[in-house]
Amino acid sequence: PVVHVPTDVYPPYYIYDTLEVGNLPDTVWIVGPEIFQDSATQFFAPVNDPELIWLESQAYHNYSLAVNPWSLGVASFDGLDENGFPYNIGTTLTNYADNLTSKPIDMSGVSASDSVYLSFLYQPQGFGDEPEGSDSLILEFYAKDLDQWNWIWSTQGSPLTGFEPVHIRVDNSDYFKKGFQLRFRNYGGLSGSLDHFHLDYVNLRTLSGYQDTVVRDFAFVYPIHTLLETFTSVPWDHYKNAPIGKMSSSVEVGVRNSDNSPENEQDGAIEIIYGGSQEGSFILSEALLNNGDLNYLPWTTYYSYHDFSAGDRFDETKTGLYEEFDIVSAATHQNSNFTLNDSTYSKQYFQNYYSYDDGSAEQSYGPTGNQSMLAIKYTPYEADSVIGAMIHFVPSVIDVTENLFLLTMWDDNGG
């Protein structure tokens, strides 16, 4: 297959040719261009992948932006494009932003008598930005023979709520064609990660009914990002020099029973995998997972905390400069429909840095006002030198790429 590497450059910059003194640049040279290209992308025809469901990647598939999701992963809509840049930074205008469009679907073999329904869950805001009342999440259907997208459903922006179910019957003959599509769009701010809506459990099916609104599933709601106490990542040599007492005493596990009836609980497990082989395991006690209830109650999310400070740990005898381990977690009940949601996979990285976060950005934080400062404290496992810092700057609302800031390192002063 064709291999390509997309490269995005932001903000735009000029490249000066200095190969020979006095020569004109040997690339296209425009003084004061009215337009500029701020990214370089190579396009290839996609392979016909039968597992592919959606055509675009503008909506952001993530595991952290939703509050109390029903399962692992949501599609989030905001004012950032597929590369994480604002559609129009600096503007106060609102317009259509992200699209999530299905592949063409062959609906020629079904009719209204087959009781076709589309269902999904949505949530405004989540851990992100509250969408205003003038913002909206929109569902449209494509009528192939008419070459026309039609409005089907929408909801206005609002403060944070739990996930709301939507259940829509498809009974218009215009949609029972080969080439039917559906798409979700958001209308909101274009200048950054703003006006969030989150989408989950999109399900188009036959032989349904108006009362068929139950999502019979048992699922993790968030991945487990770290088994370490305090940090999500530490330098490997710091860990292996003193591994005792570094495993977490409070690993958070979130699971949900979305069925409308109680379900029997079972023990779960977390395994440490290295190079495809299991090197350690921990039991997720059913009594902790369900907070002591006799069964998993209907439509209930449970958060529990598990002590892994004793027992297995990451094998400190590994000799690599950097190391990484797979964390495989599993928990279920007896009647789960979507077994992919019964497990969650993540990696424990040991490289050359300390980190507290999971690598995702739900909101932007920063100092405001003149001469303001922001500090974050790290207490390393052992004395060492600081040679750099990695910071994620979220392009949002105002272009600050020309603003100056000073990166300062403070030594510990008994604080």
Language-model regions: role of each:
Residues 1-266, 349, 356:
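Beta-sandwich/jellyroll recognition modules and their flexible linkers
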Residues 17, 105, 166-168, 286-288, ...:
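Generic detection of short hydrophobic beta-strand segments and adjacent strand-loop junctions
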Residues 26, 145-155, 277-290, 414-415:
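Surface-exposed loop/edge segments in extracytoplasmic proteins
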Residues 182-184, 304-344:
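Short, aromatic- and glycine-rich surface loops/edge beta-strands on solvent-exposed regions
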Residues 219-225, 231, 264-270, 304, ...:
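Topogenic and prosegment regions of secretory-pathway hydrolases and membrane enzymes
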Residues 248-285, 403-409:
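Beta-strand-rich binding/interaction modules
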Residues 274-317:
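Intrinsically disordered, low-complexity Pro/Gly/Ser/Thr-rich segments with frequent PxxP/GP/PP motifs
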Residues 328-414:
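Beta-sheet-rich sandwich/jelly-roll-like modules and their strand-loop junctions
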